[in-house]
Amino acid sequence: MRSSFVLVLALVVAQLASGAAAQSPVDVPFRQFRLDNGLNVILHRDATVPVAAVNVWYHVGSANEKPGRTGFAHLFEHLMFEGSKNVREGEFDTLLESAGGDNNGSTDVDRTNYVIDVPANALELALFLESDRMAYLLDTMTPELVDGQRDVVKNERRQSYENRPYGMASLELDELLWPEGHPYRWPTIGYMEDLTAASYDDVVAFFSTYYAPNNASLVVAGDIDFDAARALVEKYFGEIPRGPELVPVAAPPARLTGVTRKTLTDRVRLPRLYLAWLTPRHYAPGDAALDVVSAVLAGGKNSRLYKRLVYDLQIAQDVSAFQGSAALGSQFLIVATARPGHTAAELNAVIDEELSRLQREPPAAREVERALNQIEASFYRGMERVGGFGGKADQLNSYYKATGTPDYFAKDLARYRAVTAAAVKGMVEKYLPKDRRVELSIVPGEKK
């Protein structure tokens, strides 16, 4: 399954059970070099098990698109698996499966990534496949192929958003939170009318602009030999020509000056409330502390909102909170689903009471400790895996894209360990005010 993440979180704290995390040093040794064509390459050896991961990040996401031409980055997430010059249509998956490997891809606002996990002895196959679609995808990409995948994406949009209960919420929130002209305002999957209007030449031009070695980063990790891996990378990627030089995405200032309220009716059984705020960009001051805030509020059954809404008052079926971090700005989101007979307004009132309480007095030390334990547990679980989404290969690329260096594991952990109860209180005061946010309610009724 090809997954697309509109809100990609480095740490999904709300889904973790609390528990003590290890305090061992963070050590992810790597070698880094750059090919003449601009491809950034990161090698990491982990011989714990005989597997290898090939992880490519293209520094292009939906934020690189233009109004009227949305959904292209996600469309290529599909097209990249449909064959290239030396790999026939359908062969990408079958070759990897025959070798005992698997693969996937995802798209968000800032990047598109592709992951391949194989037995270590199939590393060369994985590098060949990845390089062939970088270099030669357009050699076999026909208008008919684009039309076929365009229809697949349209159907995905219908299934995942338009015809799914509460499915339009994330699209509505983006339009309510971000100002006109901001590249986070349109959905990663694209608008239906843009997908329909896109010409074959438009699609080709997008690939030619962004899917080039100088706009990508490659991680090879696992049971590898550094010199042999470098030789394979140079063999398969070294002759791919550079693409055009790109300028960073620009965005207008984003700020909320009041409360924006909207109610949608949908074919749902229960009301659901979404509260959203604009917050600091990823890795900026406050970003880590807001992850901790989300865990204090809704990270597990002992969290404040879960205890109050689900256990004590029994007016909610579920509640979650998270800091959705991204390069040009982030959003903090609280989502709660009412129990039968209760309303979104009731949920809103209780959530505001708990936010006010955190604004008046900091959380107890044990609450912060529990939140940090959840975050560290998630961090170390990712480090236990070489490949896949969120494994070490993926995280090396993530750190490189966000901070300019892969060497950020220890620094990342340190920024969470530095969060105090006073900092949690300060973040709620500064970034989660009741008078500057978006309030979206989805209630039962005819879908509109």
Task: Identify the residue ranges that each predicted region occupies.
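Bacterial N-terminal signal peptides
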Residues: 4-16
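M16 family metallopeptidases and their MPP-like homologs
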Residues: 44, 49-65, 71-75, 89-136, ...
